[in-house]
Amino acid sequence: MSNVPAELKYTDEHEWIRTEADGTLTVGITDHAQSTLGDIVFLELPEVGKSVNAGDAVGVVESVKAASDIYSPVSGEIVAINEAATDAPEEVNGDAYGVWLFKIKLAAGASTDKLIDADAYSKLID
């Protein structure tokens, strides 16, 4: 069974989201996603400063098995990317919840209401 930390929020597209003290959201892919994909060999992340809508494909994760889009969980502006993750994408396999991919600042009027909690995500992947 996959690891699903209770303190995070999730999407049904297998991204995890952590709300930071300054209100930005840190986004990564879940343990279930990395396990399903297998050995990750490449990450393409969004550009800092890019405005995105919830559900937009903002990047790509490629593994030896498949390529999959990475989706924005909310509407907002990309404020940071984890360049270390693009340099060593295999680190996501070893620590899916420790290796974040990008940070996003919520757009005015945007919310996190559509994100799901750990219990709902656990049911989704069981």
UniProtKB/Swiss-Prot annotation:
The keyword Iron does not apply. Keywords: Lipoyl. Its cofactor is (R)-lipoate. It comes from the Bacteria. The keyword Lyase does not apply. The modification N6-lipoyllysine is found at residue 65. InterPro entries: 2-oxoA_DH_lipoyl-BS, Biotin_lipoyl, GCV_H, GCV_H/Fam206, GCV_H_sub, Single_hybrid_motif. Belongs to the GcvH family. This is Glycine cleavage system H protein. It comes from Burkholderia cenocepacia (strain ATCC BAA-245 / DSM 16553 / LMG 16656 / NCTC 13227 / J2315 / CF5610).
